[in-house]
Amino acid sequence: MATVAAIGGQTADDSFGRDRLVILASSLGTIFEWYDFFVYGTLAALLGRLFFPTANPTAGLLLSLATFGAGFGVRPLGALLFGVIGDRVGRKYTFLATITLMGISTAAVGLLPTFSNAGLWAPGLLVALRLVQGLALGGEYGGAAIYVAEHAPSGKRGFYTSFIQASVVGGFLLSLVVTLLTVFALGKPAFDAWGWRVPFVVSLLLLALSLYIRLKLHESPVFKAMKAAGKVCEHPARESFGSLRNWGPILVALFGISAGLTVIWYTAQFSTLYFLQQTALVDDTHAKLLSGTAALLSAPFFVFFGWLSDKIGRKPLMVSGYGLTLLLLFPLFHGLAGAANPALARAAAAAPITVAGVDCRFNPFDKQQATACGQAMQFLSGRGIGFHRLRSFGLPLRIKIGSKIAVDLGDVHGKFDKALVEQALIRAGYPTTSDRVERSDLGIVLTVLAMGILSAMTYGPVAAILVELFPARIRYTSMSVPYHIGTGYFGGFLPLISQYIIAKTGDPYGGLWYTFAVVAVALFVTVVGLPETRHRDIAA
């Protein structure tokens, strides 16, 4: 593509313009993907009430999130399906199909009847649409990454493909703007009644723009040359997964690349936001605006590290990004706590909380815990307050705040008393919200930005790495499946796993151990198994 001959006599200016169109068309798919992801995630609680009505709001939310997760579950299947099509039919037509399915299934959510109108048909249709979208998404990223990389000059693959990763931020910011503007324009009651449909239907505009641009493009030069030479693979799945030689790169792509970079990205975007909202007690709107600001500032770093990988190599950046994440993960979150809610940080240091009881069974998914000790843990977890759990062979429940006993079960006649504990927490200096005057919004943005930069170090070069790991004839299939297993399972379930660990242990930083463990494995696999790929001929 870098030569005039390769582009059919086009001038250098024509080639440059075409390159920009290729990058834009591919990046729009990523914006689309993450726009839907953030919109649905933000509205999960509301959709739970509308489509899964139940006496237990927690159960409704979990069913809504399970429906959301169903899309992740089928992404590897979509990766296999569209990967085979992309390797046999071509890159362009495959990712035209995936963007169309994505757009229709996303917009259709905004047209669905709710449970009150259609009964069980409503959640059934919602699940069906999420499955269709999950299948389409399984083929979208691989197609976009390959299409850009196969157009890029050999010395600029990291730079060109990095725009796909940077556009994830675009999806987040677009969802934030559309949702907040809709709420502002309609008011909260109208938004909850029917306005929630607007962000989904608006995605039709993204679909129209994406199709308009993609229809202007031609097939990738690598695939055209391969087709002209009669080297198109007839059985991509069999050749990808039936060859022992190809299993090494697949496992490296899964455990060394996709799993590691995904949990860092989810931690940078989601865990920081949840931490601000649930632990640091920053109000929802400000938490999103501060996170959005940090995300916007981090976007250029994805492009920078993609460009840098063209200069120094892919592997050094991956190893450095993983290593720095292991070193800085916990310090950054402790710093975030101090910036977002200094009063809470002071109280936690001066008056740590212990919960002791004979029976401290605690299931974070139950609306009401069976024992007083479990109820105490549920209350503290809901308040975002950390605690240490001890086993007691005496009283059914004892809560200590610092050196003072706040509650002995006998003091409250055998029942857990929220009001009594709340009063004790306030006396010990535990705040009920983040003080906007005392907190440092700049400190919050800089800390979240630091996590975003760590994510950019590993996410920026990823598309180039995955494309370069596999031969052209089976590239779409071979890279898409491990990528979506990594992003869908290791990353997609990170919020659930992390929040479960936090609630179960009482440690507001406990969920970070999941990220730490996955990144540690990814670092080992990358050091041992990832070759340097930047000089490979991807036409081979």
Map each language-model feature to its residues:
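Low-complexity, proline/glycine-enriched hydrophobic segments characteristic of transmembrane helices
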Residues: H334-L446
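Extracellular/periplasmic helix-loop-helix junction of adjacent transmembrane segments
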Residues: A44-L77
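Extracytoplasmic gate region of multi-pass secondary transporters
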Residues: Y40-G41, N246-A295, F333, V358-L390, ...
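Central cavity-lining transmembrane alpha-helices of secondary-active solute carriers
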Residues: L65-V84, G103-S105, G170, G292-F305
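Glycine-rich segments within core transmembrane alpha-helices of 12-TM secondary carriers
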Residues: A136, G158-V183, L206, L332, ...
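Cytoplasmic membrane-interface "Motif A"-like loop-to-helix N-cap segments
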Residues: R88-T100, K311-Y322
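Hydrophobic core of transmembrane alpha-helices in multi-pass small-molecule transporters
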Residues: L112, A118-G138, A343-A356, E438-M457
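C-terminal ends and interior cores of transmembrane alpha-helices
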Residues: P53, T100-G119, G323-R346, R427-R436
